[in-house]
Design a protein with these regions (language model features):
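Short, glycine-biased loop/turn motifs at secondary-structure junctions and
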Residues: 1-168
Length: 168
């Protein structure tokens, strides 16, 4: 299965600290681990999971072996990095963060009275990056329109990313 993975700039996982062998023209080495979501296993993302986990660098990863599809990720017993998604760079990451911040502002101000409690946290949260700002926009949508609005906002974010990154 082809999926995606966010890593730090040096190829380490932000949660485990595992340093991946980065591909150099051909796929990286296979990494194996027991499947135990959030504890062990090779965690990958489907396209719709990207806004939830948006990190520093984005990689295409091949998952194989035992697999468990979770709500916001896929966990497999084997995986290897295929290539970096070069379009996801610091400028693109900042653009996505800004888009999410602008969307959060628009949503917070779309109702009367405006949701000033949300409006006050958007700009200070920008340094935290795109995962937090995409969450804020989705939560504001949910506060206004319920769970369906949350999911619609997440789908909107996914569409924005997919279109600009050329992902399917």
């Amino acid at each position: 299965m082809i999926a995606y993975k966010f890593l730090r700039a040096d190829g380490t996982s932000p949660f485990t600290g595992y340093r991946w062998e980065l591909p150099k023209g051909e796929p990286g080495a296979w990494v194996e681990a027991q499947v135990d979501p959030c504890r062990s296993g090779i965690h990958g993302l489907r396209l719709g999971d990207l806004p939830l986990w948006a990190g520093r660098t984005l990689w295409e990863i091949e998952l194989d072996g035992e697999m468990r599809k979770e709500r916001s990720k896929v966990v497999a017993s084997r995986g290897r990095l295929l290539h970096r998604i070069d379009a996801w760079d610091d400028d693109f990451r900042a653009e996505f963060t800004r888009m999410c911040a602008d969307r959060a502002h628009d949503l917070a101000n779309s109702v009367s009275p405006p949701l000033s409690n949300w409006e006050a946290v958007v700009e200070p949260s920008i340094p935290e990056g795109p995962a937090l700002l995409s969450f804020a926009a989705a939560r504001i949508a949910e506060e206004i329109g319920g769970p369906d609005a949350y999911h619609a906002e997440r789908a909107r974010q996914t569409g924005w990313l997919a279109g600009r990154l050329g992902l399917e």
